[in-house]
Swiss-Prot record:
Taxonomic placement: Bacteria, Pseudomonadati, Pseudomonadota, Alphaproteobacteria, Acetobacterales
Keyword vocabulary terms for this entry: ATP-binding, Cytoplasm, DNA damage, DNA recombination, DNA repair, DNA-binding, Nucleotide-binding, SOS response
InterPro entries tied to this protein: DNA_recomb/repair_RecA, DNA_recomb/repair_RecA_CS, P-loop_NTPase, RecA-like_C, RecA-like_N, RecA_ATP-bd, RecA_C_sf, RecA_monomer-monomer_interface
GO terms classed as biological process: DNA recombination; DNA repair; SOS response
Protein name according to UniProt: Protein RecA
Recorded GO CC terms: cytosol
SUPFAM superfamilies: P-loop containing nucleoside triphosphate hydrolases (SSF52540), RecA protein, C-terminal domain (SSF54752)
One of the Pfam families matching this protein, by short name: RecA_C
Task performed by this protein: Can catalyze the hydrolysis of ATP in the presence of single-stranded DNA, the ATP-dependent uptake of single-stranded DNA by duplex DNA, and the ATP-dependent hybridization of homologous single-stranded DNAs. It interacts with LexA causing its activation and leading to its autocatalytic cleavage.
GO molecular function: ATP binding; ATP-dependent DNA damage sensor activity; single-stranded DNA binding
Organism: Acetobacter aceti
PROSITE patterns: RECA_1 (PS00321), RECA_2 (PS50162), RECA_3 (PS50163)
Cited CDD domains: RecA
């Protein structure tokens, strides 16, 4: 935590300029943008509530990613964009889910992962963690469409005990029978 930099810019353009500057400087190894949905374009912030800004967010992301792609490729920086899932209105067939910010991020990214909470972990009546599923949706570096499930314990992170049990089952050292292990 000693080497953690946090920036809370006013607008999306400012956030992406800061990101570009940090990547160019070579001073950071990992840069996380949390979240793409929060990168609100300046014109939208300065406009009135009822104003229509169709495609402004998508244009911002497209311009920024064109610039950032080359910069990131020449640097030794890992850039992570967190995003949210939204539902498309009126979709009858196909997947109604989409991500914010247009298609640029889908196109320019090297790896895309879909991370979802699939259940809760409880100790009696108290929720102590989440069961999580990660699907690799796109991968330019390795085979795509792989999937993994693991437990995230609050205040702890990924459950070491759960991982050891899963590895034991996979290796044949631990036997699983329903919800019981032996």
């Amino acid at each position: 935590v000693d080497n953690l930099l946090i920036s809370q810019p006013d607008a999306g353009e400012q956030a992406l300029e800061i990101a570009d500057t940090l990547v160019r400087s070579g001073a950071v190894d990992v840069l996380v943008v949390d979240s793409v949905a929060a990168l609100v374009p300046r014109a939208e912030l300065e406009g009135d509530m009822g104003d229509s800004h169709v495609g402004l967010h998508a244009r911002l992301m497209s311009q920024a990613l064109r610039k950032l792609t080359g910069t990131v490729a020449r640097s030794n920086t890992l850039m992570i964009f967190l995003n949210q899932i939204r539902l498309k209105i009126g979709v009858m067939f196909g997947n109604p889910e989409t991500t914010t910010g247009g298609n640029a991020l889908k196109f320019y990214s090297s790896v895309r992962m879909d991370i979802r909470r699939i259940g809760s972990i409880k100790d009696k009546d108290e929720v102590t963690g989440n069961q999580t599923r990660v699907k690799v949706v796109k991968n330019k570096m390795a085979p795509p469409f792989r999937q993994v499930e693991f437990d995230i314990m609050y205040g702890e992170g990924i459950s070491k005990v759960g991982e050891l049990i899963d590895l034991g089952v996979k290796a044949g050292v631990v036997e699983k029978s329903g919800a019981w292990f032996s």
